[in-house]
Amino acid sequence: MTTKAQSYLTHFRNIGIAAHIDAGKTTTTERILYYTGRTHNIGEVHDGAATMDWMEQERERGITITAAATTAKWKRSGTNEEYTINIIDTPGHVDFTIEVERSMRVLDGAVAVFDSSQGVEPQSETVWRQADRYGVPRIAFANKMDKTGASFELVVNDIRERLGAIPAPIQYPMGQENEFKGIIDLVRQRAYTYTNDLGTEIQEHDVPAEYADKVAEMRAQLIEAAAEVDEDLMMMYLEGEEPSVEQLVAALRKGTIDKKIFPVLCGSSLKNKGVQLLLDAVVDYLPSPLDIPAIKGTTENGEVIEYPADPEGKLAALAFKIMADPYVGRLTFVRIYSGTLQAGSYVYNASKDKRERVGRLLKMHANSREEVTELKAGELGAVIGLKDAGTGNTLIGDGDTRVLLESIDVPEPVIKLAIEPKTKADQEKMGIGLQKLAEEDPTFKVETDQESGQTTISGMGELHLEILVDRLKREYKVDANVGAPQVAYRETITKPVDVEGKFVRQSGGRGQFGHVKIKAEPLEPGAGFVFENAVVGGTVPKEYIGPAQKGIEEAMQSGPMLGFPVVDMKVTLYDGSYHEVDSSEMAFKIAGSMALKEAVQKGAPALLEPIMRVEVTVPEEYMGDIIGDLNSRRGQIQGMEARGNAQIVKAFVPLSEMFGYATDMRSMTQGRASYSMFFDHYSQVPNNLAQQLMKK
């Protein structure tokens, strides 16, 4: 790699701002855009004008739905070095976890924003775990330090206790709640106060005397934490030497990139305090594309290839989001891991096995855009002109060996609704609109019942589907009626069986013949479907194995109990027979389907239901009512935890029992409780209930 390319990549940061729904994430992103000069006036979420929240509904609801990728420039304070920071705004609402998943997949580092008065909330925990899964280094920002009940210590302790991570506070607040007036940098031992409301005039001075002891104590702890992850610093520490600022920053950077420690900062985005220091910390501690491990791809014969970040290397890019844009049509957001993507060139979509032409390339600002001729390794941008690329698809150079990059985990939908247009004339328009929305969002599924012709949509929660029905109305001008929410059950088998499927049709001339023998066995919950080909001696020829598997998979889409998909089982195709003339792919597909249907019938089928992890934050005096009510909903109480003067009740409750819970909870507690709910796992429905459901 040339020195120029290296220097260019060193000055790059791809980060996400990840947080709980009201921790102030969009406001923090807004401030970053304001101070980096990308927006000339500050957009406030609570007056509906935020730049990042650019879908109409997001502005109305004050929540962020779609992760928009924005490019900003920042000069590190006290230096002349300019950095490019790509920010991916991620939604904090649990119904949109796929958006968080996709963004985690393409980020190099993240800023986790916490509400200082609330500490680590349930959704923050979910987002943190996703970042753990994708190995994303993080710095934490204790926001809302000016709010009543704000406590920097609460955030630091919660990171340690609730997240099991090692926090490394690199700042300390001067005052809390309405006394919050500035920030002390523990690394450089300087204090910063703000002299105007916009936060653009910052005064730097010595640490005030009343904070001297606290700062000395916390700085000693910080050096100790850094020494744990850096051997050179450990030697100095043991010999009682004081490290220089540069040595301390280097050690903290190393520890952060290795995900061993997590620097913690503080501020108030709404009051414009601490955001510039946060940007400096993004530059100081979060990785550039050169600091993260090279992305790995797998060839068709299982060989693993590494793609280091190098603009002159072979092209490897991941499509992480599809959006329909009213002006230019379909936008495919991509992260370039290696090589350079040129406008007007051809690429090979390895996931779909298709050659595609790249039209124009755009770099996005929250809702304006800049056209570019190329996107290089380490960059994020949007492509116009790709017709087939979907979320998680791998794009490589035209003519290169087929390689697949690790894709994105797509959770299964847990809730479904029947939907129909208010007027018959809109039927076709509704079909097109739903199909386009499903292309953008892989957790949204559209199905039409073959017998009744009824269309159902399924997704990750009530809010998720409500927003998609709303988009159908706004963007595709289709008014739709929706039914009551239904639970997306699953079916499975509970005992192993051995069955065969034989399809024989003799009707003058060429007949049809397909015959397979399969073993079906239950797997543990969440294991999905596993197919094994154990045919020996060619009793089922190789070319018929694929069609038989396809028949099996298609038959699994509708189980015998209530017609829900069959999951968590392993099918082994071990024998069968064929006919030289009459056998065909179609015959084996039907035989596979017949065998599977019989296997599920004989395998003591059971119904599975989604179980949600519910956390209710409730004042002490209503706790008994809340627990009694959750028990009556077949809930299993997992524990309680005191938080301030409230209690957090944690429970597992079946989704079918949680519809309309918000209203009941409010009336039980006079509106003083709040709750959050996430899908956790599937579990078997008790027999008596399964019987009732089947009678309906």
UniProtKB/Swiss-Prot annotation:
Q: Which Pfam families match?
A: EFG_C, EFG_III, EFG_IV, GTP_EFTU, GTP_EFTU_D2
Which regions span the lipid bilayer? Answer: none
- Which CDD domains does the entry mention? EF-G, EFG_III, EFG_mtEFG1_IV, EFG_mtEFG_C, EFG_mtEFG_II
Please state every residue range assigned to the domain named tr-type G. Answer: 10-290
Q: Which UniProt keywords apply?
A: Cytoplasm, Elongation factor, GTP-binding, Nucleotide-binding, Protein biosynthesis
List GO terms (cellular component aspect): cytoplasm
**A Gene Ontology molecular function term of the record:** translation elongation factor activity
- Biological process annotations from GO: ribosome disassembly
Superkingdom assignment: Bacteria
Q: Does this UniProt record's set of keywords contain Nucleus?
A: no
* Stored InterPro entries: EFG_II, EFG_III, EFG_III/V, EFG_IV, EFG_V, EFG_V-like, EFTu-like_2, G_TR_CS
Report the subcellular localization: Cytoplasm
Q: Any idea which positions bind GTP?
A: 19-26, 89-93, 143-146
Give the matching NCBIfam families.
EF-G (TIGR00484), PRK12740.1-3 (NF009379), PRK12740.1-5 (NF009381), small_GTP (TIGR00231)
Family stated for the protein in its record: Belongs to the TRAFAC class translation factor GTPase superfamily. Classic translation factor GTPase family. EF-G/EF-2 subfamily.
Q: Which PANTHER family match?
A: RIBOSOME-RELEASING FACTOR 2, MITOCHONDRIAL, TRANSLATION ELONGATION FACTOR G-RELATED
Q: What does this protein do?
A: Catalyzes the GTP-dependent ribosomal translocation step during translation elongation. During this step, the ribosome changes from the pre-translocational (PRE) to the post-translocational (POST) state as the newly formed A-site-bound peptidyl-tRNA and P-site-bound deacylated tRNA move to the P and E sites, respectively. Catalyzes the coordinated movement of the two tRNA molecules, the mRNA and conformational changes in the ribosome.
Name of the protein:
Elongation factor G
Q: What is the lineage of its organism?
A: Bacteria, Thermotogati, Deinococcota, Deinococci, Deinococcales
